[in-house]
């Protein structure tokens, strides 16, 4: 302000059920202190949260089938992650929503998230992703507790160093 500069108003971190630390721990002091919002990306963890992947089964039309995504697939499709994804399927089913919609809605339900960047390779995925906004009201505290019980990824809040 003293230099007549405009400060940042948004941060763009990765945010999904498996990548939460920055958004829910490191950046917490920024939201109210500086009024910073978040434009997050990778809400379905490169497609992992769609539930279409399983150990040794990568659909031919998926990004993980491409040579330049092999390393990401190897890092992402580990037993613990796939177990958690499978544990989320009954929750999505109970709500009558797709796994992608559940993942996107979960991100959008965070009050510090201003927008969620999604990706799609098909028109049908865009339509499905947009319907995630209708899912946000279904994410009651009880549903969020069920989700957390499966993924167990809530970060611990950083202690102040002052």
Q: Language-model features: where?
A:
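Amphipathic, coiled-coil-like alpha-helical segments
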Residues: 153-157
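Short coil/turn segments at secondary-structure boundaries
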Residues: 143, 159-162
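Beta/alpha (TIM)-barrel catalytic core signal, keyed to glycine-rich beta->alpha loops juxtaposed to Asp/Glu
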Residues: 1-151
């Amino acid at each position: 302000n003293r230099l007549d500069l405009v400060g940042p108003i948004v941060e763009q971190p990765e945010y999904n059920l498996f990548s939460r630390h920055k958004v829910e721990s490191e950046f917490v002091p920024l939201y109210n202190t500086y009024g910073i919002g978040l434009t997050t990306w990778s809400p379905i963890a490169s497609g992992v949260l769609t539930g279409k992947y399983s150990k040794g089964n990568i659909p031919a039309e998926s990004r993980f089938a491409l040579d330049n995504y092999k390393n990401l697939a190897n890092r992402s499709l580990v037993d613990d992650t796939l177990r958690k994804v499978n544990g989320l399927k009954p929750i999505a089913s109970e709500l009558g929503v797709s796994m992608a919609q559940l993942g996107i809605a979960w991100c959008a339900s965070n009050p510090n998230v201003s927008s969620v960047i999604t990706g799609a390779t098909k028109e049908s995925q865009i339509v499905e992703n947009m319907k995630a906004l209708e899912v946000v009201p279904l994410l009651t505290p009880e549903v969020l507790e069920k989700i957390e019980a499966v993924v167990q990824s809530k970060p611990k809040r950083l202690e102040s160093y002052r």
